[in-house]
Structures are given as C-alpha cells and as structure tokens.
Amino acid sequence: MINTSHRSQSTFQPSVARGASPQETVTNKVDLFDPAQPPDPLRQAFDGITNAGGVAKAQLLQENQSAWNARWKLVEGAKDSITAQYFCWDHDALGMALLGHMFKKARNEEVQIRLMVDSTGDTFGTRGFKSHIGGKDYLQEVVMTGNAEAKVYHPHWKKVIDQALAIGSTAISANNHDKILEVDGNRGITGGRNIGYEYFVHPDDFKGAWRDQDIYFEGKETAHALRRAFDVEYGAPWITQKVRGDLLGNWVQRDLELLGAYKMMDLWLKDKPLSMEEKQHLRSSEDGRKGEARHLMDRALAALPDEGLERAASRRERKSLLKLAEELVGYTELRGSYNATAPDMHDAEVKIIDKTSSVGIGTDELNSTLWNLAGAAQKSIYIENPYVVLSEDMIQGLRQAGERGVQIVLGTNSPASTDSAVTQAFFLRDWPRLSATIPNLTILCASGNRKLHAKTAVIDEQATLVTTYNLDFISQHTNSEVGSVTWSKEFAKETVDGFNQDQADPLNGVVEYKILRDEQGKPIRRDGLPVLDEKGDLVNEPEVLFGPANHLTPDMLSQYQKKVHRWDFLRKILPQLNPVDTFRKH
C-alpha cells in the first residue's frame, strides 16, 4: 500500500527493467556470472538458497476469487496425489466444499491424499475439523476411503505436556502456520490464505473480506521442495496426532454431505455469472437467497448418482446441505468465476524456504534467508505484513539497509483494520521508535473495512517473497512457517502494482504514520531535546505528526494502552508469555 499524499518521494514505483528479461534469467544464467560485471549481491543471496526449487511458471494470486478458483482447479486436475496443510480450515461452505472435493478424488479416483490441520487454528474445536464438536466426522469419512490420511498438529494435550516438561519454553505457542497445497509433485500454492470464506469472497459480498496474497506455481523442483516442507512436520509423530475412523466404522455417514458440498460449489463456480440486478436481489432478499439455495441443493443432489452415490438424502443431510447452500449463494461474485480471466503466468525461478516449529526438528531456512535477502538490498525493500512486532535483530537488519540508502516501505494494519489486538498494542508502542531509528522508512497503515493479511516483500524490484510469515516473535521463533522467493522482474512488478492498487482502494483507507523531521529528514522535537544520539540510537521519544490519535477514537486508544500495560505486567511475572500472541486467524 502506497500513500503519496503525505510524502511524494516515498512512492514505490518499479524502474525500467535492466539486463536480462525474466525468460533470459531462467534459461540462460551466463550473463549473471560475467567477470566484467560487478557481482549482484541479491542474485548471490538468491543463489545461496540451495535444494529448494528451480525453474517454474509463477502466478500471483491477489484477487480472492482467483485464489479460490486456482485451488479448485488444482485439486480438480490431481491425478496421483494431494498434500494439504492449513493453519485454519473452517467447516463453512468453502471449507466443506474443498474437503468434499478431496473426498471425491480419494473415493472415486483413488488419488492419494494427506491432510493436516493445526490444533490452535481450530482452538476450541468448534469451527474446523479437529474434534467431534466441530467436523471431525467429515475428516474421518475422507480417511476411511482407504486412500487418505489426516493428522492434527500439536493437539492441546500435547502442548500442555510439552510445556510442563520445559517450563519457560515456547511449546504452548508452537503451531503449524504453514499453508500448503501441492499436487502430483509438479504444482502447488502457498501464501497467506487459510481455508475460510473471509479469504476468498469479494468485498461487495462481505465488507470485511481479507486482502491477502498467494503464489501458484508449476515446476517439479519447486513442488518437491513444498512437499518436503509438508513432510518434515507431518512425519513427526511426537507432535502430530493421526485421525482414525471410529472403532466400528463412521457411526454417522458424511459421504453425501461431502459430495453434496463439493457439487454445489462446482455448480456455483461454473454457472453463468449473475447480472448486477441478480446480485443485488440475492444480497438484499432473504427469500431470494433461500429460494436460490434450495434450487442449488436440489441440482447438486440430482447430480450425485453421477458421482457414484445413489441413496436419497436424509432429513439431517438435507438440512446440513441447505445451510451450506444458503451461505454459498450469498457469495454472488463467486458465481461463474471459474472461467474468468486468470492472472498472468510468468517465467521465473521459484524457491521454497521453510522453518519448523519450536517443538519440531529445528529446521530454519526461512529466517536466515530473509536476513540474507534484506542484507543484499541495494535500492528498495517493500514489505506488506499484517502483524508487526519487530525483534531487535529485525530492527537492526532494516536499520542497516536504510543506512545504505535503501528505501523501505512498510505496509500493515492499524487498530481499525486488525484482528490481532495484542500485536497492534505493541505496534502502537513501537512505531515511533521504528520511524526514528530506521533511515528511509515509510510506515503506511490500513484503516478501512478490509483487513490486510498478505505477507509479502519485494526487494530491488527483482526478488519477491510470498510467505506465511508474520513480522512477530511467534513466526520468528515458535511457529512452523513456509514461503516462496521468486526471481522475476515481471512477477515483482505485478506485486508492486498490487501494492499501489491497495493504496488507491478506499476500502483500505491507507494513512501514513509520521514523526516530526527537519528538512534533511532527521528526527527532531519542538522542545529542542535530541531524538537520536550520535550512533543513531533513540534517546528521547519522537514527536508524532500523524499517528493513531489522528484517526482512532479516544476509547480505542485507551483500550490499547491498557492492553500494553497488562501484557507488560504479565510478561514480567510469566516470561513464557513473551511469545504468546492472539489465537485468532493468523
């Protein structure tokens, strides 16, 4: 997100591409090592990511409907295998449909499937598939096809034991935050999106729809690297719990509901798009939605014999499907979106960077790669991240880049758009210090209806990161995280274009947080006290020109101040709480 109204020189625009085209970069690397040319530090840092991917086709998934259809088509085209891991996998209309799609692939086509969900992503077991309170029966139905396996990552009872065995550790907050969908060893998707309606519906259908970002790729080396990131956590029996069928079979059959949810979604995506009048009717008329939902459900049930399911739906099953259908028909922009123009596909190199959780085997390729790439930046670093509580090493890394003259733009949430009160409380406390001590830093915050959830960065208009990684302690030290690094000027440009579109979108309400500076850009105060010492360290609080107090209510500011005091007190008496963040949808 870019805001040019406050400081025009901070606008992040890609320069004219220099040197090889993305295609030449992929197919002919000789020019990269020409001794007559000075070495490119960023390319050297990228080449230092070993055994993690290679030549691929890459597609940036910015729009929510495109991201959903990419997943639908990926599963639809699976011939041999599917691996999937999501921090959150809700049993709403979208989550049930995707699980039903995989059930169909396992049951009817004998595609081998492995699924994993995180226990904290479904904290109380009511919204996902980890427990019988929620939807474990459906996960069991998939497993009982004989062609699927499923696991729950770090169940709460294991968390309690691990924490008791290691007092003061981060075991209580060690989650699998990965978002992985990989098919047939040659295609995959990763990025910020979980499986739930907020991530895939249009803002016209739900004002609070998330703004997120994923990458779809085609390439064997990259797909195998993403699968390895799945395997390293899936294959750890001391952290995971296998999902098994009930002792005497699944006592309540869920096959018809799963296939019905799949078929309703498939029909809805492939139907003729709705006219504007039809959309408005469904959005405004409850009777209209109920009528459309019954029609959609009846069409799906009539098609189930073609999927090998001949029996009639029971009253319970019809009630369950009708509820899903009534939700689905409210997402009017999804209707007919299957055949919409897809985002551009780019020739690129795509590498996967992985990190296991703090109770895993200790693999961490992600943090070191992030620092190496940031350390190699010569011109610009653009970051979009929803939760910003920077550690000291993160701050120092960005500070060193800024001191080299690198322009740094950080886009994140404000309290008006966030879902994480805890991280925002600390960001509100920290941002003036970041602005004062990191040279060439611009801080832009969303303050509108949409929640920013993208976890991306573009470095020197060439290397693009699309990850699951939040800029906080949890992601850095405790969670399992995964991400991609894409080498392509075209892919980087498209990402930057998306940032600029975010700035212009009134739903985001982007504002720039600023401190008082002199004409040379040095932080100053009106009372004459210095802000920084000779080393560039903070000695007095900066003076805020525009910040939270300029766009938040006094009540909201007071609530956040209380949160900071409360957490600072708790962290003093309970050091193990230092990494604990909100257990909302990250």
Q: What are these language model-derived features?
A:
Residues 1-27:
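Non-Sec secretion/translocation targeting segments of pathogen effectors
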Residues 39-41, 46-81, 88-375, 413-462, ...:
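HKD-type phospholipase D/PLD-like phosphodiesterase module
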Residues 244, 445-586:
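Long, C-terminal catalytic modules of enzymes
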Residues 370-372, 376-418:
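Long, well-ordered mid-to-C-terminal structural blocks that present hydrophobic/aromatic surfaces
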Residues 79, 86, 109, 146, ...:
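Sec/Tat-exported extracytoplasmic proteins
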Residues 22-45:
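N-terminal carbohydrate-binding accessory modules
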Residues 273, 277, 282, 296-301, ...:
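C-terminal low-complexity, acidic/polar tails when present
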